[in-house]
Design a protein with these regions (language model features):
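Glycosyltransferase-associated regions of secretory-pathway enzymes
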Residues: 2-150, 166-308
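Small-residue hinge/turn detector
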Residues: 151-163
């Protein structure tokens, strides 16, 4: 901050001298070049410092996650070899999955041939609820935003079948092996929150309770009927009417408000809120390799965000 202020003062003085013809044009150009060079290298230095600070922060967070996972209880059963993926057209038409995401799905199947792969479209989801969870069907239909419906379904599907859910824009990097199966529930890191991030209203409440990361739900896994999955499902189910009423007050053209609302009601913030309140945290394994938007070393979330 001091350097930026000093450089700003230098620039103002320089402009003053030029305006009053105290400096020659040649001298002014030289000083401008000096100022530009200082600014350039100052920003490069700041970027380097920020990168180092972020690297150190993520390393610390990695140690925090290791400590959390050290308390994990032994899984009574392993996560079943099931992979669930979903594609629903907003316009209600037949699935038109983008080519790159079809490749991710194909790669997922090739890397995990021993897994049962279940793909749901809009009609499949409707039938699933009508057949298995009629009490949740109304919630699914009533949730005000398209992505909320899909969020709700992914939680119910994993609660029902067990296995792993992956967004279509998640690129597999290596096969799911025994080490990932030997947990009762697995969630990745969505976002880390350093000291600067903690000033953001979205992250501040988590930082205040020492929760410096958000859990992701672009990919996760669990055994069937896992109690944490039940918490996610029932919390949305029980609050659906409140969500509907809040949504009515949101300006449809205000995308930022819609995104924030979704994050908090069915998205990563919602999952993190449930995790913070969940007493049996030792039932969950936090999958982290120090990076955001990854499923450990197994997959990377490309964050295409077509729902936005």
């Amino acid at each position: 901050m001091f350097r930026e202020s000093a450089l700003s003062v230098f620039g103002v003085v320089l402009m003053y001298l030029i305006y009053n013809k105290t400096l020659s044009i040649l001298a002014a150009l030289f000083l401008f070049a000096v100022l530009f060079t200082i600014l350039y290298y100052d920003r490069m230095y700041q970027s380097w410092i920020n990168a180092k600070e972020q690297e150190a922060f993520e390393k610390r967070m990695g140690e925090v996650v290791k400590e959390i996972n050290a308390g994990e209880s032994t899984a009574i059963e392993t996560i079943p070899r099931i992979i669930i993926q979903v594609w629903v057209q907003k316009d209600g038409g037949k699935p038109r999955v983008p080519a790159n995401q079809l490749e991710y799905m194909k790669k997922m199947r090739q890397m995990n041939p021993a897994f049962e792969h279940i793909f749901f479209n809009g009609e499949d989801i409707e039938q699933f609820f009508k057949t298995n969870y009629l009490e949740y069907y109304k919630t699914y239909k009533d949730l005000p935003f398209f992505i909320q419906k899909l969020d709700f379904f992914r939680y119910v599907a994993i609660y029902h079948y067990g296995g792993f859910y992956f967004d279509m824009d998640v690129e597999p990097l290596k096969p799911l092996d025994e080490s990932i199966l030997n947990h009762s529930a697995v969630f990745p890191i969505d976002e880390y929150a350093n000291s600067i991030d903690c000033q953001n209203p979205r992250m501040n409440s988590y930082c205040l309770v020492g929760q410096n990361f958000l859990l992701g739900q672009y990919a996760f896994g669990a055994v069937a009927k896992h109690p944490f999955m039940k918490v996610l499902v029932d919390t949305i189910h029980q609050n659906s009417l409140k969500y509907i009423n809040i949504a009515k007050q949101i300006n449809p053209s205000n995308k930022n408000d819609i995104h924030y609302f979704v994050y908090k009601t069915t998205g990563p913030d919602f999952v993190t809120d449930c995790y913070v309140k969940y007493k049996e945290k030792n039932q969950l394994y936090i999958l982290s390799n120090g990076k955001r938007q990854v499923f450990g070393d197994y997959a990377a979330h490309k964050y295409i965000g077509l729902w936005k």
